[in-house]
Amino acid sequence: MGLETVIKDIMSAAQTEVNVINADADAEVSQILDDARQTAKKIMGDRLAKAEDDIKRLRQQEISSANLEVKRAMLNARKEVLDKVYNNAIDSIVSLPGSKQEELLKAIIDENDSNGSNIYSNKDSEKLVRKLSSLEYAGNIDCIGGLTIENSDGTVRLDYTYDMILKNVNEQSLKQTSDILFG
């Protein structure tokens, strides 16, 4: 009987040790699983946060892009309107009555005749310029109206064509014109 008791004691101690080892293993497995779950949750949370940030960034880029397109379209529309106003001004100048043309040319010539020796104009204004100016008529130039005065050696040209005057006025008052048209 002594051997059986020793065997039982050994078996009981072994079983207790196995139970302790199994409990420790179960606890370690449980801890590993909990850690893995926590790590997975953190990874999922990080990825979800990154995905949300990416979505916000993409949305902001799309909004910015759309705003830029709207501004570009508005600027193009405004430019078209300003170009139309400019072209209407050209049409108005071209269709001025003869008396108004003569009045404008006379004012330019009276102011600047002494600054040169040659004068140029477009073909339509040639007779009128010859009549109004004492300068030598030097030929026709391509313009909607007005004239150009040149000194005797051709080194200085004063451009009083309506094209140049309108261009200068347009450049100087573009912002004001835009403010009037578009508020």
Curated annotation (Swiss-Prot):
Per its UniProt record, what HAMAP family does this chain match? ATP_synth_E_arch
Q: Does the keyword Membrane apply?
A: yes
State a single Gene Ontology molecular function. proton-transporting ATPase activity, rotational mechanism
Function, in words: Component of the A-type ATP synthase that produces ATP from ADP in the presence of a proton gradient across the membrane.
Similarity section: Belongs to the V-ATPase E subunit family.
Location in the cell reads: Cell membrane
Please indicate if the UniProt record lists Cell inner membrane as a keyword.
Answer: no
| InterPro entries, sorted | ATPase_V1_Esu (IPR002842)
- Full protein name: A-type ATP synthase subunit E
Q: How does it sit in the membrane?
A: Peripheral membrane protein
Q: Name one GO biological process term.
A: proton motive force-driven plasma membrane ATP synthesis
Q: How does it assemble?
A: Has multiple subunits with at least A(3), B(3), C, D, E, F, H, I and proteolipid K(x).
Q: Which organism is it from?
A: Methanococcoides burtonii (strain DSM 6242 / NBRC 107633 / OCM 468 / ACE-M)
Q: Which domain of life is it from?
A: Archaea
Q: Where mainly found?
A: membrane
